[in-house]
């Protein structure tokens, strides 16, 4: 019996019909047949997935049948090639709807929907999540067992390699959503191509005659599938080179040939000479990567264990197509943010100039990016991911400033108001963004205000540099661009944007050179790693194969440990003696190797034949496989293969252990007092003290520090028991254990729990009961970088030692000041008042002396035109007194006075200028300009108003010449 919706024909009739069908019509028949086959496969999938009740199965079957019937109708309608699939009409083409339809399409085909991964990837080779496949990279590489055969996601991504094109082209972004479907050793090319075509032309209703396909030039298999199975005409299949159609997630890792789908906005231009790179005609919207290879660090490519599928569809691009707008920015994913920025600038986007639209697009795109990045715990800084946040946000601020955007009434910054729109649109992509609203808005406000403080000065300096470059007909030097970056916080791309607007080029190579020089200088003091030894240890780890066993959680000594390797002088040796410095690898050790912020143990190794080694540091090597004991041979000689007893310094371990547990309590206390947004940025648990770095946008008050300290000591006095347990990372997350943001964890983790107080992932050593810590005292709190604070503290015996040190200081002060300890504060306060009074008296006397010296100079004033000019030098006079002297001289000289005074104090130079209004008018002179030139001659700078200016310099040897030039300038201008 024939299937509903299809005609039945005998074999002869079919043969006769085929002979009369044109090649084009025959290809359309193939397309229709492919779609029906795909729908039939989908029906089978739905039948398999319908595992519920009989009613549920019946519903699934009915749904599948309806889809097949709809597909039959749709293919008949589309055979004209003149319009999109009417079956897709009336469906939700909003960004939210497209996202939902994509995910449901693949869920119906056996894919498990997975949440978006963080923008901070576990992969150390990639700074930010740039593709949907990154969270599955270990599965693709065979490093982790697959949890499911198929998956589908919507992944938030950030890429900044095309930042200069943001707002310029129709579809470049820093932040975007990547819709994807993935197969882990399950289906491969044929199914991926068929489903991609069905999704595009049936679910989304794209006209199939407007869809083009590209394949890797050597991928004949993919070409054949598109042509023979899917039915795409050869004229709309393009073979492309490796740079276009061979995809990789990063410099290393899974990769493979890919096939891309393009939408044709202008089919009337014909097939001949069509260029898929022509952005005015085509937009690439779907990329299918046939992930079957792996690229290692050396660039070698090898087959993966399984053949996998990794796809990506740009949500913004599909929204542009389905919503019928001219660019991605005008879709409902970004346009509301742009409209908010435009309204704050008093503009209507539709009537804006091209430049204004570009600026608004930058604001819309970058605001999305920083909103999601801050939500994922990335705060503005000058390094790594933090610099990307700072760079993007400062571009938002600058473009907002150019548009005239002002903060809303009662607010000090405008970026939070714009970000609120991005946050309100984020829930389906990432529900955490709304929950992190307070963190996001606070960081945006803090960073915007910080940038505003230097933006004005930086813009002035950049304007001066550009004018000089124009006058000299040269570009902006890399050194100057770096000064703007280093001193004023100007990202390089802002400098290049402003310079480009003025037609000036920037020396990018010079900038990179200056940046490299600064890095090398800052790193020089920290280069203590023995690279030779490191290479030797890595080789040892490879040769041994086995891992060192750490038994130090329960033991501080080992009676029998075998010496597996000895490294001395950067080489693996069989024996070492006579005070040699060595690195020793044991098979079993109680020594804790430095990690997680806790320092390595100290102690001794003893051999049966009398050798003694003093261990001063312990580190991991060989990717963490071996534990290396850095030691000095104190007595005898140590041999490879010998047996030793290993003994940890119990007192040092106790102190490190106390400090480590105290850091856990400290983090919990900070979260309780300052809020849950506080997160660890680093730590050091040493023998003498602890250090804890944390993300916090504001300074911590003394009252808050006292509250934190009191909380920690209260928990110590509660004598709470600690537990340490290994468990799957999923279980740890479910329990709510605190994890250090950005840290890479394995599948099994160790959870240290102080019930009701603290629960963290940690591999360090800890007390068994909080009472063992004894006490806790904060020594200092300060900011160490933008948005990062540092607390230094002591615990246990360190508290007693600190009190003893401070007691000794108090006794010494009491003795020196000859007062009891309790009266020290009042005595010091009185001395401070006396000192201030004495300083004021000294300043007054210096001023009087300067005036007296200046009075003697009145007679030296020159009459130039109708003005009275006095340029003189008064050494040893501070800036305040120099100003008083200049004002006194100007008063005595009266109308037409022009006074410039200079003073040398060691190598430093002080300058001051006062010009009467007549001088300013007659000579067209400004005090700030004249004095600025003099200061520059002295290696400094400064300026001021037309009538008054102050400046300084660092080269007193040039003061006379600078004053002579100033006098010449005045004389020339006024002698008319």
Swiss-Prot record:
It is an enzyme of class 6 (ligase). Keywords: Aminoacyl-tRNA synthetase, ATP-binding, Chloroplast, Ligase, Metal-binding, Mitochondrion, Nucleotide-binding, Plastid, Protein biosynthesis, RNA-binding, Transit peptide, tRNA-binding, Zinc. The keyword Signal does not apply. Binds 1 zinc ion per subunit. Its main location: plastid. One of its GO terms (molecular function) is ATP binding. It holds the Pfam family DHHA1. Its EC number is 6.1.1.7. It catalyses: tRNA(Ala) + L-alanine + ATP = L-alanyl-tRNA(Ala) + AMP + diphosphate. Residues 1-54 form a transit peptide. PROSITE patterns: AA_TRNA_LIGASE_II_ALA. One of its GO terms (cellular component) is cytosol. Monomer. Consists of three domains; the N-terminal catalytic domain, the editing domain and the C-terminal C-Ala domain. The editing domain removes incorrectly charged amino acids, while the C-Ala domain, along with tRNA(Ala), serves as a bridge to cooperatively bring together the editing and aminoacylation centers thus stimulating deacylation of misacylated tRNAs. Belongs to the class-II aminoacyl-tRNA synthetase family. Catalyzes the attachment of alanine to tRNA(Ala) in a two-step reaction: alanine is first activated by ATP to form Ala-AMP and then transferred to the acceptor end of tRNA(Ala). Also edits incorrectly charged tRNA(Ala) via its editing domain. This is Probable alanine--tRNA ligase, chloroplastic/mitochondrial. It comes from Ostreococcus tauri.
């Amino acid at each position: 019996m024939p299937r509903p919706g299809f005609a039945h024909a005998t074999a002869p009739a079919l043969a006769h019909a085929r002979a009369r069908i044109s090649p084009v019509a025959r290809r359309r028949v193939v397309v229709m047949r492919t779609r029906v086959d795909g729908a039939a496969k989908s029906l089978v999938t739905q039948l398999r997935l319908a595992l519920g009740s009989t009613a549920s199965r019946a519903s699934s079957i009915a749904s599948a049948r309806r889809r097949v019937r709809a597909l039959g109708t749709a293919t008949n309608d589309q055979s004209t090639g003149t319009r999109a699939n009417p079956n897709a009409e009336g469906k939700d083409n909003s960004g939210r709807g497209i996202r939902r339809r994509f995910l449901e399409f693949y869920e119906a085909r056996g894919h498990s929907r997975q949440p978006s991964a963080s923008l901070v990837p576990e992969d150390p080779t990639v700074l930010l999540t740039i593709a949907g496949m990154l969270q599955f990279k270990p599965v693709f590489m065979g490093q982790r067992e697959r949890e499911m055969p198929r998956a589908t996601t919507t992944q938030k991504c950030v890429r900044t390699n095309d930042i200069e094109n943001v707002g310029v082209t129709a579809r470049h972004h820093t932040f975007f959503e990547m819709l994807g479907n993935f197969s882990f050793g399950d289906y491969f090319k044929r199914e991926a191509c068929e489903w991609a075509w069905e999704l595009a032309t049936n679910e989304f209703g794209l006209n199939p005659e407007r869809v083009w396909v590209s394949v890797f030039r050597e991928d004949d298999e993919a070409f054949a599938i598109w042509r023979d199975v899917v039915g795409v005409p050869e004229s709309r299949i393009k073979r492309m080179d490796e740079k276009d159609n061979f995809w990789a997630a990063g410099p290393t890792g899974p990769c493979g040939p890919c096939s891309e789908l393009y939408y044709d906005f202008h089919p009337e231009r014909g097939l001949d000479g069509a260029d898929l790179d022509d952005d005015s005609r085509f937009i690439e919207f779907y990329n299918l990567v046939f992930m079957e290879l792996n690229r290692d660090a050396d660039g070698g490519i090898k087959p993966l264990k399984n053949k996998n599928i990794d796809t990506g569809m740009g949500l913004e691009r599909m929204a542009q197509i389905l919503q019928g707008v001219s660019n991605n920015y005008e879709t409902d994913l970004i346009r509301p943010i742009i409209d908010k920025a435009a309204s704050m600038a008093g503009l209507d986007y539709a009537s804006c100039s091209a430049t204004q639209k570009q600026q608004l697009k930058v604001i819309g795109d970058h605001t999305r990016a920083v909103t999601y990045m801050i939500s994922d715990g990335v705060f503005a800084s000058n390094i790594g991911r933090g610099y990307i946040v700072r760079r993007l946000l400062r571009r938002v601020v600058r473009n907002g400033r150019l548009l005239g955007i002002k903060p809303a009434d009662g607010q000090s910054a405008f970026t939070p108001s714009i970000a609120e729109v991005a946050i309100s649109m984020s829930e389906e992509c990432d529900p955490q963004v709304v929950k992190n609203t307070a963190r996001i808005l606070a960081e945006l406000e803090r960073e915007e205000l910080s940038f505003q403080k230097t933006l004005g000065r930086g813009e002035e300096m950049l304007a001066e540099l550009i004018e000089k470059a124009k006058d000299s007909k040269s570009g902006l030097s890399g050194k100057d661009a770096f000064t703007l970056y280093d001193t004023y916080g100007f990202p390089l791309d802002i400098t290049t944007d402003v310079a480009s607007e003025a037609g000036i080029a920037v020396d990018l190579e010079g900038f990179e050179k200056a940046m490299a020089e600064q890095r090398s200088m800052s790193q020089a003091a920290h280069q203590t790693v023995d690279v030779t030894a490191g290479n030797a240890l890595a080789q040892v780890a490879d040769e041994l194969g086995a891992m060192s066993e750490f038994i130090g959680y329960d033991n501080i000594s080992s009676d029998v440990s075998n010496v597996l390797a000895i490294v001395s002088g950067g080489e693996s040796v069989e024996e070492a003696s006579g005070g040699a410095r060595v690195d020793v690898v044991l098979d079993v050790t109680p020594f804790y190797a430095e990690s997680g912020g806790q320092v390595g143990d100290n102690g001794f190794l003893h051999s049966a034949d009398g050798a003694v080694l003093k261990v001063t540091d312990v580190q991991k090597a060989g990717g963490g496989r071996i534990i290396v004991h850095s030691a000095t041979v104190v007595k005898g000689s140590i041999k490879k293969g010998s047996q030793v007893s290993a003994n940890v310094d119990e007192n040092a371990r106790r102190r490190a252990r106390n400090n480590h547990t105290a850091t856990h309590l400290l983090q919990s206390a900070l979260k309780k007092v300052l809020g849950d947004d506080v997160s660890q940025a680093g730590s050091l648990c040493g023998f003498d003290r602890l250090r804890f770095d944390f993300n916090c946008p504001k300074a911590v008050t003394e009252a808050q520090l006292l509250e934190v300290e009191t909380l920690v000591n209260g928990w110590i006095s509660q004598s709470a028991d600690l537990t340490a347990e290994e468990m799957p990372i999923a279980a740890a997350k479910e329990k709510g254990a605190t994890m250090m943001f950005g840290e890479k964890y394995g599948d099994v983790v160790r959870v240290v729990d102080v019930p009701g107080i603290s629960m963290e992932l940690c591999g360090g050593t800890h007390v068994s009961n909080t009472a063992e810590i004894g006490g806790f005292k904060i020594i200092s709190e300060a900011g160490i970088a933008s948005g990062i604070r540092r607390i230094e503290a002591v615990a246990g015996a360190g508290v007693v030692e600190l009190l003893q040190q401070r007691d000794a200081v108090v006794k010494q002060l009491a003795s020196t000041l000859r007062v009891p300890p309790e009266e020290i504060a009042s005595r010091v306060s009185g001395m401070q008042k006396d000192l201030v009074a004495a300083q004021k008296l000294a300043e007054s006397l210096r001023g009087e002396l300067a005036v007296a010296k200046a009075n003697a100079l009145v007679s030296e004033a020159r009459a130039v035109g109708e003005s009275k000019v006095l340029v003189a030098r008064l050494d040893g006079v501070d800036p305040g007194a120099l100003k008083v002297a200049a004002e006194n001289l100007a008063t005595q000289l009266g109308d037409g006075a022009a006074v410039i005074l200079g003073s040398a104090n060691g190598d430093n130079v002080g300058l001051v200028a006062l010009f009467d209004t007549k001088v300013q008018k007659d000579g067209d002179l400004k005090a700030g300009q004249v004095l600025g030139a003099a200061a520059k001659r002295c290696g400094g700078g400064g300026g001021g108003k037309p009538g008054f200016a102050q400046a300084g310099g660092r080269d007193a040897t040039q003061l006379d010449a600078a004053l002579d030039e100033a006098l010449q300038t005045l004389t020339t201008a006024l002698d008319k």
